[in-house]
């Protein structure tokens, strides 16, 4: 009886997966227009949750209202994920996507 064959050696990857080697590109938090929330409430949320001045919060709210969406924050993935969660908790429609550089 012969001994079992040794397992074939698994080749070691020459490079790491792209997710580990890509630079940490900025991410964007996008707030979308919805038929539910009042403009005054959206402005209030931008002020209290994201820390914008009343003027800047109003500008962003008007962009959401007229264009259908606005980038309301950007940065590293963890920060933007937090902003999206906070806006969603406040009842706004928010998503995130990688900023194209």
Swiss-Prot record:
Pfam families membership: ClpS
InterPro entries from the UniProt entry: ClpS, ClpS_core, Ribosomal_bL12_C/ClpS-like
Complexes and interactors: Binds to the N-terminal domain of the chaperone ClpA.
Role description: Involved in the modulation of the specificity of the ClpAP-mediated ATP-dependent protein degradation.
SUPFAM superfamilies on file: ClpS-like
Species name: Corynebacterium jeikeium (strain K411)
GO aspect biological process, one term: protein catabolic process
Name of the protein in question: ATP-dependent Clp protease adapter protein ClpS
Family: Belongs to the ClpS family.
């Amino acid at each position: 009886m012969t001994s079992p064959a040794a397992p074939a050696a698994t080749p070691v990857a020459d490079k790491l997966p792209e997710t580990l080697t890509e630079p940490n590109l900025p991410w964007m938090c996008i707030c979308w227009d919805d038929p539910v929330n009042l403009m005054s409430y959206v402005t209030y949320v931008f002020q209290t949750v994201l820390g914008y001045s009343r003027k800047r919060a109003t500008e962003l709210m008007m962009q959401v209202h007229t264009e259908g969406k606005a980038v309301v924050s950007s940065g590293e993935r963890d920060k933007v994920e937090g902003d999206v969660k906070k806006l969603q908790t406040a009842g706004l429609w928010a998503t995130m996507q990688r900023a194209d550089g």
